[in-house]
Amino acid sequence: MPAKTVSHLNFETSISTETVPASPYIPGSGNVFAKFVDAISQTGWELWYFDGVSKDDQSAISIGINRSARGLEHGGFTVQIFAIWPDGHTWHRDLYFPESTVTSEDGHITGLWEDAGSGGKVSFSVTRDCSLTMLTFAVPGVVDGTMHLETLPGDSGLETNPELGPRAHIVRPKGRASVKAELSLSSGDNSASERFVLGPSANGGMDRIWTLDTWPKVMTESYYLRAQVGPYAMQITRLFSEAESGCKPYTMARLYRDGKLICAANQVLTYEEQDFSKDSLILSKRYDASSEDVVTGAYRDKNIGYVVEFVAKGTDGQRWMFQVDHERIFWSYPTSAPGPEGTGNTGFIESVIGGADEEAYFGVGIGGQCQLS
C-alpha cells in the first residue's frame, strides 16, 4: 500500500448498482483500511466494530461504524452507539453521515464519518501495529466524548483463518483490549445529557467484518460473544447460512489463556460428531421454562444462554467448557413483523463461568444474537 491512501465515499454518489469486489484480505494484518475503496454496491457491507464491558459493574458500550446502503432512507452511512449503565438503563442512537473517509498514512489508519451540514462527526484512529485505538464523538445535541482501546499483551490471532463461511470475513485487529470511555449522551428531549464512564476494569476489542451480500443472503441466525473469564479470553461469531444453502453452521471463534492463543476454531461440531481433525466449537442453547428469574430476548427464541465448548484438534484434544447466562438486555430491535413467531436482534450482558476440566472461572462479556428467519 502506498505511503498515503484515501478512501472517500459519498452516500449519494458512491453506492453502485453494479457488483463491487472487496479488496483482498491481507494475511497477518488487522485489515483496518477500507475494503470497498472507491464505491460500494447496494448489497455490500463493511463494519468497524468496537466494544467494552466492565467486570465490576457490568456497564458496557458498543460502537458499530458502517459502510453500506442500509441508511438509504436517512441519507447516510450508519453509526450505531449502544451504552448501558451499572443500574441497567440503556441508551441507543443510530446516526447517519453522508461522508465517510478512511485514510492510511504510513500504516496509521484514520476514519471519519461526517455531516458537514450539521457539524456532526465520528472518527477513529488506529496505530500501525493496532496496539492503540481512539474514537472521538462530536455530534451536537447527541453525543460528545472519547473511547480508548489498548491491546493486551500476548498473541494477536491475526495469522489465523478469517473466513466466516463462504460469504463473509471477520478479522479482529484488537481481539483483546483494555477499554476506557467517557461520553456525554443526550436523549434529545431537552433533558440534561447523561455522563457515561467505562473503565478502568473494562475489557473489549475491535472487529472488522465485510461481505458482498446483504445479511439475509449470508445467514438466517447468528451469535456473537466477546468475554474475559479469569485467565481466558474468548471471541465467538457463529452463524447459520441462508436456507437455500441448508442453514449450515460456520464459525470464527478464538480462545486465549494468559494471552496465548490455545484454540482457533473455524469448524462447528455437535456433541454427536467426532471430527477432531481441526480446532472446533460446540455451541448449544440453554432453555428453562420453569424459572421466572431468567433473562431472554423478546422474540421467538427464548433461550436463557448458551453452553460454549472449545475443542482442540486431535483425538486427545483438550476441551474447555463455559456456561453463558443472559444477565441484562443491552439492545433489542425486531428483524421481522411482530407476532409470536417474530424474530429480532438482541444484545446481552453475559455472565460466563467455566474453563478446563474442573475449573470454574467467572467473567463477563457482551453477547449478541440475531434471527432473520
Swiss-Prot record:
Functional pathway: Mycotoxin biosynthesis
InterPro entries: DA_C
Pfam family, one: DA_N
Induction: Expression is positively regulated by the trichosetin cluster-specific transcription activator TF22.
Disulfide bonds: none
Disruption phenotype: Results in the production of reduced, though significant, amounts of trichosetin.
Catalytic activity field: (5S)-3-[(2E,6R,8E,10E,12E)-2,6-dimethyltetradeca-2,8,10,12-tetraenoyl]-5-(hydroxymethyl)pyrrolidine-2,4-dione = trichosetin
EC number, as in UniProt: 5.5.1.-
Protein family according to the UniProt entry: Belongs to the Diels-Alderase family.
Protein name, as recorded: Diels-Alderase
Source organism of the structure: Gibberella fujikuroi (strain CBS 195.34 / IMI 58289 / NRRL A-6831)
